[in-house]
Amino acid sequence: MVTTYLLFIVAYLLGSIPFALVVGKIGYGIDIREHGSGNLGGTNTFRTLGKKAGFTVTIADILKGTLATSLPMVFGLDIHPLWFGLAAVLGHVYPIFAKFRGGKAVATSAGVLLCYSPVVFAILAVVFFTLLFTTRYVSLSSMVTAVVAVIASIVSGDKIFIIAMCLLASMVIYKHRANIGRIINKTEPKANFSKKQK
């Protein structure tokens, strides 16, 4: 039982590692919270620091979700791995290492799925990138993909999977509430795939 509680804390702490902040400060000498949207996530890193930093942060944020979700399997615990994944996402959104001001749950949630259901992860990746290249709205693509994740979980019939996806989707949409207003008002920035970035 003690091991279980400790691993939940570890999962939260893994999620709390603010890679956008670390990359910004160490690699570029800036606090990314003071630039762009101020969000500690991949999208703001792409827009503020460029492709190299953006990919680095996004991959790192995905992997911390994957690693946290794998903890019960690594340590042989008979507890559903998605609970540990949820702890990591909570840490990503409300990181103790960054004054509880984190990202929007997308990349780390993807990492949770990568560990728990690679097939669903692959399907959602196709959905996300299809929407992104069609609409050029990262936020809209993220929210719609989150809803599709809920649908996929319902189809699976896995009750804990359904609960976890509903919680994650709710968190993703809640963290994008300001984006929803900007999309409606047509002021939401679009991804610029032709822009040259370092």
Swiss-Prot record:
Keyword Endoplasmic reticulum: no
EC annotation from Swiss-Prot or TrEMBL: 2.3.1.275
Protein name, entry field: Glycerol-3-phosphate acyltransferase 2
GO cellular component term, pick one: plasma membrane
Recorded metabolic or biological pathway in which this protein acts: Lipid metabolism; phospholipid metabolism
Family label: Belongs to the PlsY family.
SUBUNIT field: Probably interacts with PlsX.
Name of the gene: plsY2
GO molecular function terms listed in the Swiss-Prot or TrEMBL record: acyl-phosphate glycerol-3-phosphate acyltransferase activity
Biological role: Catalyzes the transfer of an acyl group from acyl-phosphate (acyl-PO(4)) to glycerol-3-phosphate (G3P) to form lysophosphatidic acid (LPA). This enzyme utilizes acyl-phosphate as fatty acyl donor, but not acyl-CoA or acyl-ACP.
Organism annotation: Bacillus thuringiensis subsp. konkukian (strain 97-27)
